[in-house]
């Protein structure tokens, strides 16, 4: 399987997995044009689309792609049923695509119906987990997002985190504002800064590394607890997550 990223809009990535025969899976096609261009350039045959949630920058290209390739099966959560989804999937179910079994993981927070798809090593996590950050809480609660991230953080170490936006640099600036002396965060920030200066993608990232540099996955880390305790005493990791998310919203 080959993993490909297609830039869209200002900072979106549309992910495409293809096999040696050229069959492909498209994830969150917010815009059809760059996908159609990539399909033509690579002679791919689209078999399926995965949708993680209902926001337009993730579903906007579905209609045109299905018109062009009517055999495509469109998988998505209930909230995408009016966005072109033909096969509604929910937590604990599986989608069989390109000969691989993808587990569906419910991850409410960014939206109430947000889902992720996992087939080792690929995690298509939409706007739930970003490198160095997590999605804004447009519909769900901090508690829901905390639990969703916990689900993802226990996936295998070598999981490739394929999120939908190039937010890594701004996320790492925030991480440095919280833990300015953390060696892992500083090293990763420098690496990301160099990549973005060359207009290069920072994704996918390896989950094992993400656990070290993403403050939203470190709510039980003593260094982070000490920082938060300087401002307020919060006993539960869930409360610390909410504190971080609120800080990031104002950053």
Curated annotation (Swiss-Prot):
Signal peptide: none annotated. The keyword Ribonucleoprotein does not apply. Its EC number is 3.1.2.6. CDD domains: hydroxyacylglutathione_hydrolase_MBL-fold. Pathway: Secondary metabolite metabolism; methylglyoxal degradation; (R)-lactate from methylglyoxal: step 2/2. One of its GO terms (biological process) is methylglyoxal catabolic process to D-lactate via S-lactoyl-glutathione. Keywords: Hydrolase, Metal-binding, Zinc. The keyword Zinc applies. Zn(2+) 1 binds at residues 53, 55, 110, 127. GO terms for molecular function: hydroxyacylglutathione hydrolase activity; metal ion binding. Its cofactor is Zn(2+). Belongs to the metallo-beta-lactamase superfamily. Glyoxalase II family. Thiolesterase that catalyzes the hydrolysis of S-D-lactoyl-glutathione to form glutathione and D-lactic acid. This is Hydroxyacylglutathione hydrolase. It comes from Escherichia coli (strain ATCC 8739 / DSM 1576 / NBRC 3972 / NCIMB 8545 / WDCM 00012 / Crooks).
């Amino acid at each position: 399987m080959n993993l490909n990223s297609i830039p869209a809009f200002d900072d979106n990535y549309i992910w495409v997995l293809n096999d040696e025969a050229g069959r492909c899976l498209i994830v969150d096609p917010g815009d059809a044009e760059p996908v159609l261009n990539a399909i033509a350039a690579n002679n791919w045959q689209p078999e399926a689309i995965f949708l993680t949630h209902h926001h337009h920058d993730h579903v906007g290209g579905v209609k045109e792609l299905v018109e062009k390739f009517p055999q495509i099966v469109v998988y998505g959560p209930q909230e995408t049923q009016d966005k072109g989804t033909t096969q509604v999937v929910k937590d604990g179910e599986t989608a069989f695509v390109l000969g691989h079994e993808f587990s569906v993981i419910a991850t409410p927070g960014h939206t109430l119906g947000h889902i992720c798809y996992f087939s080792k090593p690929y995690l298509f996590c939409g706007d739930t987990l970003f490198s160095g950050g997590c999605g804004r809480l447009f519909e769900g609660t901090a508690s829901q997002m905390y639990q969703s991230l916990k689900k993802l953080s226990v996936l295998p170490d070598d999981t490739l985190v394929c999120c939908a936006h190039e937010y890594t640099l701004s996320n790492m600036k925030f991480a440095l504002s919280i833990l300015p002396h953390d060696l892992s965060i500083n090293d990763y920030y420098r690496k990301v800064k160099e990549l973005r200066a060359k207009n290069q993608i920072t994704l996918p990232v390896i989950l094992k590394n993400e656990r070290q540099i993403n403050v939203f996955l470190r709510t039980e880390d003593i260094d982070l607890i000490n920082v938060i305790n300087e401002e307020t005493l919060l006993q539960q990791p869930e409360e610390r997550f909410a504190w971080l998310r609120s800080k990031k919203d104002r950053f």
